[in-house]
Amino acid sequence: LVQSVFDSVYDKYDLMNDFMSLGIHRIWKKNLINMMNPSIKSNLIDVACGTGDIGKLFLDNTRKNLSITCVDPNKGMISKGKEKLNNYKNIDWKVATAEKLPVQDNTFDFYTISFGLRNTKNINKALTEAYRVLKPGGRFLCLEFSKIQNSNLDFVYKNYSKLIPLIANFV
C-alpha cells in the first residue's frame, strides 16, 4: 500500500512535502546535515532518499567531492532524483529497501533515513541493515515523526494527518 502511494506521487513528491509541511521539512533536513560535521573522507548512505534532498544538502554543505549513495525502493523517486540532481556526478543511485541494502558491510560513515523508517516492512531488520553497513564509529541519523505528548497539539496533528491523503490528491 505504501509503495503504491509513492508510485502515484513521485513526480510531485517535493512539492507535496513543501505543501504538507509548510516547508518545515527543509529546516529539519538542514539541521540534520549540520549535525554531521563530516571529514574530508566521509561518505554517506541516504536510505528512503526520495528525490535526493539529503544527498544534495550533504554535498552542498560540505563543499567537498564526497561519495554518497542514495537508496529508495521506488524507481520513480530514483528517476526523479537523477533528473533533479544530474549535475551531481558522485551520487550512486540504487533501487532497494532499507531491509536489504545492496552494499558491503562497514562501508559508510553516515547513514540517514528521513521519514522513511515508519514505511519499512520490518523496522528491526532495517535497523540491523543500518548497523551492518555503517563503519565502526559510524553515525546513524534519523528524522521521523513521533507521538505528540501535548493533547491539544495531538488533536491538531491527528486531524491534519487525516487531511494528508486529500492534500496529496490535490497536489
Residue ranges and their predicted role:
Residues 22-42, 57:
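Conserved alpha-helix/loop element of class I SAM-dependent methyltransferases that forms part
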